Amino acid sequence: MKKQLITFVALVALPVLTFAQTADEIIEKNIAATGGADKIAAVKTFQFDQSISIMGMDMTGKSTVVVDKSIRNDVTVMGQQMTTVVDGDKGWTINPMQGGTSPQPLPDDQLKTQKGNMHLFGTDLFVAKDKKYPIEFVGKEKLGDKDVFNLKVTRPEGVANYFIDATTYQIAGMNAKVTLQGQTSDIKIKYGNYKPMEGLNLPTSLDLENPSMPGPLTITVSNVVFNPKVDPAIFAMPK
């Protein structure tokens, strides 16, 4: 009778124990799959090129980031360059596509969103753990044909759900609510084409959907350079 009782308890407990993988365990495995905390933390600055495609229109871009401090994005479309910069708690932009040729301060909501991007792409969960953002394990589900773990992260700029591949523990996707120009919208990103880069494994393609955009946007990352010397003057707002 005792053996039967132990067997019964084991069978009942098995689904609970299988499901009870914690957010901390998932994040630790994600960080390990990315290359490890030491490798991620060692990146203080980085630059990369972007190829951007939306609705048959192709653009190119270059980004420079000083982790947790500054970011500059330059995007060229139809022969014109759009620039967006955040430096500390301030930001500015030049957008000739909207008739602007002189720098303008970034609105507060755009500033807040851009500040959330001042880290190495694909390392969001490392950042969430390091900054002690509230994290909740929602459960295991499907993202397309992949089994994924759903982690809800409350970031300063909004709530984001990260979908972690249950096999590779790499970030497969992210859904977030973002408020821009007074409008709250749902952003969806799919991460793919992970590649090894100096001991790190990072996504090099991102498919982004946002109801405010005319269609899906695809970003392809290339020419990543870690820890280049960055001149602080590139973040200064032109006079």
Feature roles, as predicted:
Residues 63-70, 87-90, 110, 165-168, ...:
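A short, sequence-level motif marking secondary-structure junctions
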Residues 24-99, 137:
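N-terminal mature ectodomain segment of secretory-pathway/periplasmic proteins
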